């Protein structure tokens, strides 16, 4: 991906699964090495990705180099947002960017696609949870810290623009 080529964001298909699983594992290893433990990689496998593909909840960012980023977008998140009203928000999870493409707008493109999808679904908000070390990234992308869950997970919310 040259610096001028914006990533193309689309709903993932079954042919993307292996590449997405590798990308998520690589991202989790990188975050863990930086002191920002991510999701449980043992749970990130083909079955995990297939579930999101079947529900059209897995987005990928791609360019001439292949898949360079991904995330999930769901209609609910009972673990971190149990009291949320159904339909008031969409929930972004598992945002991962190939390290060779960090700083090139991949996260921004994925988040903008999630915002658009949330609006299309009639949701007023896009929410996520993240490690506190990642709050700055999301705040720079327009999100606001809402709460801290269990002392270790920042709950981040964003109103639709």
Where are the regions a protein language model picked out?
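C-terminal "cap" of GNAT-fold acetyltransferases
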Residues: 84, 124, 130-134, 141, ...
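Conserved beta-strand in the GNAT
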Residues: 60, 66-75, 91-96
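Conserved acetyl-CoA binding element of GNAT-fold acetyltransferases
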Residues: 83-99
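Conserved GNAT-fold acetyl-CoA-binding loop/helix
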Residues: 21, 25-48
């Amino acid at each position: 991906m040259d610096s001028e080529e914006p990533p193309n964001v689309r709903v993932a298909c079954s042919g993307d699964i292996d590449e997405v699983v590798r990308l998520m594992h690589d991202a989790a290893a990188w975050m863990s090495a930086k002191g920002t433990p991510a999701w449980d990689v043992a749970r990130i496998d083909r079955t995990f990705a297939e579930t999101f593909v079947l529900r059209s909840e897995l987005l990928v960012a791609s360019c001439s180099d292949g898949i360079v980023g991904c995330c999930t977008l769901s209609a609910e998140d009972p673990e971190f947002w149990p009291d949320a009203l159904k339909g008031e928000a969409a929930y972004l999870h598992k945002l991962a960017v190939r390290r060779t493409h960090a700083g090139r707008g991949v996260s921004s493109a994925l988040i903008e696609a999630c915002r658009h999808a949330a609006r299309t679904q009639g949701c007023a908000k896009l929410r996520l949870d993240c490690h506190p070390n990642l709050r700055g990234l999301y705040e720079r992308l327009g999100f606001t810290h809402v709460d801290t869950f269990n002392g270790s997970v920042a709950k981040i919310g964003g109103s639709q623009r």
